Amino acid sequence: MTVPEIFDVIVIGGGHAGTEAALAAARIGQKTLLLSHNIETLGQMSCNPSIGGIGKGHLVKEIDALGGVMAEAADEAGIQFRILNSRKGPAVRATRAQADRVLYRQAIRQRLESQPNLWLFQQGVDDLVLEGERVAGVVTQLGIRFNARAVILTAGTFLAGLAHVGSANFQAGRAGDLPSNSLAGRLRELKLPVGRLKTGTPPRIDGRTIDYSAVAAQPGDAPVPVFSFMGNAASHPKQVSCWITHTNSQTHDIIRSGLDRSPLFSGAIEGIGPRYCPSIEDKVVRFSAKESHQIFLEPEGLTTHEVYPNGISTSLPFDMQVKLVRSIKGLENAHITRPGYAIEYDYFDPRALKSSLETRMIEGLFFAGQINGTTGYEEAAAQGLLAGINAALKTQDREPWCPRRDEAYLGVLVDDLITRGVTEPYRMFTSRAEYRLQLREDNADLRLTEVGRRLGVVNDARWVAFNIKLEAIAQEQNRLKTTWLSPKSLSETDALRVIGKNIEHECSLHDLLRRPNVSYAELMTLPGAGEPVVDLAAAEQVEIQAKYQGYIERQKDEVARNAYYEDIRLPQDLDYKTVRGLSNEVQQKLNQFKPETAGQASRISGITPAAISLLLVHVKRGFSSANTKKSA
């Protein structure tokens, strides 16, 4: 049957990408349908029970600044919070939350069900409806047809998913869920560039069988951080510790003895796994000189005894999993509640996408999440948010929003995917961002909330709070710049305590704050400094902006210089074989990937600065058919 009502946007998949996509499209005001094979697993944390981390936390903050829900859900479900790299500079500091799986899923479900313009329906999707070269809807497993102007595919690991435990394998999207084989077959028929990737998960352990006296406690931070800019530590549930143990030589010997039974080394697994989250057998082989590997024992929630042993992802046979787990200190009597496994799945070359995450081949079809070759909840959610925004904008006949590399980690993520592609699952790190000093966690709202308001994804409450914060920052900066201390007004004791030496001439509080060893909190204890700003987030911004002002200005100058290439649009009908002087390799790559700007072209592997110069000369002369038409 065909459902008579037409949706603006249909989202396939209810994981981290799908939920953010559906919510974003609905917030913009478009009639949105979220299809999932099981409504009970919406927002499911399929692997590790945590949100954030280095690079990943930055994405979560950006999602939050744009009105997304991942940070809010993490605040409501987080049972331990830590700031990573807290002793390093603000550019690389990152928030990480250990989450209760059940509470996280509940937080996501509640937001989905209370979002206007959003409908949920429990059905897997078997087919896409195409009209010429554009998508027109989907067909579910029961043959129900839903029509839409845009479709977002967020299938995770479900496309032709195949799970492995030793020599055994079974079809699955994840343990306990069937794969989407019909949809995978349909996508392959469309001749989209497809490949196989692999990921894995460790065995789960009954916490009652762990000897906690033999492992080291890792408590969270105090005071407890919050993830969302709208968050409050009072909303956090009970806080608990994680625990740390290590593998040893016996563990490694057990793993080596079972490598011939590992699907990873027997050739049974074709997909390539994540470099930065390897299986324990991969770590033992690749780092053979290393005597031990750190294992984090992470509680799965407040109402379960299950523990997630982060660091021993494996697809070894179950009997080997039992041996390796029980060889680890504190786990000698551990009971495994669920075996670890590897899963391989279809992904599609993200170089076949536009910056908006719309496919180049099929108009109105968007991809987000692991289908694009990424790994991680945060990377998926960020893509889902962007795809949801752009799908909604497309149905409103508005221009897409494509964040730049200097604007957001989301911009770095998408640009890396569509210009460089992936040969292994892509995860975000701060090192991937060349402008990371201005892409900090702490200023994600200052960078993106105004953009989100213009796009329609930021609600009134967030907008009001954002403007109050902006005003507090501006007022405090002005106060510090106009409040002066003289050598006579500052005692030697106070000067040495806060500044480290006597001041020789009259200084503004802002000048003193720019000194590396002077903190805002200490500065406010000086006589005559006045009352500190009440908003701690505003105080943090005042201090960071003062201390890093020179560095940030230099980075902004660099961005401005490089913006020249980012602003030069390349005609999508340009045949690069007509550009004189380009090598055959460069012509082939440019024709294959069709970069949207000269900046994108410059980041494609094998494209030299000389090739970009030739390309710019060609475009400026108006040799493309598009430019010819404009001049006619």
From Swiss-Prot:
Q: One Pfam family of this protein, by short name?
A: GIDA
For this UniProt record, give its keywords in alphabetical order, as a comma-separated list. Cytoplasm, FAD, Flavoprotein, NAD, tRNA processing
Q: Which GO biological-process labels does this protein carry?
A: tRNA methylation; tRNA wobble uridine modification
GO CC annotation: what is one? cytosol
Chief site of localization: cytoplasm
Domain of life, per lineage: Bacteria
| Residues annotated as binding FAD | 13-18, 125, 180, 370
Q: Which cofactor does it need?
A: FAD
Classification via InterPro entries: FAD/NAD-bd_sf, GIDA_C_N, MnmG, MnmG-rel, MnmG-rel_CS, MnmG_C, MnmG_C_subdom, MnmG_C_subdom_sf
Q: What does this protein do?
A: NAD-binding protein involved in the addition of a carboxymethylaminomethyl (cmnm) group at the wobble position (U34) of certain tRNAs, forming tRNA-cmnm(5)s(2)U34.
Give the multimer and partner information: Homodimer. Heterotetramer of two MnmE and two MnmG subunits.
Protein name in UniProt: tRNA uridine 5-carboxymethylaminomethyl modification enzyme MnmG
UniProt organism field: Nitrosospira multiformis (strain ATCC 25196 / NCIMB 11849 / C 71)
UniProt gene name: mnmG
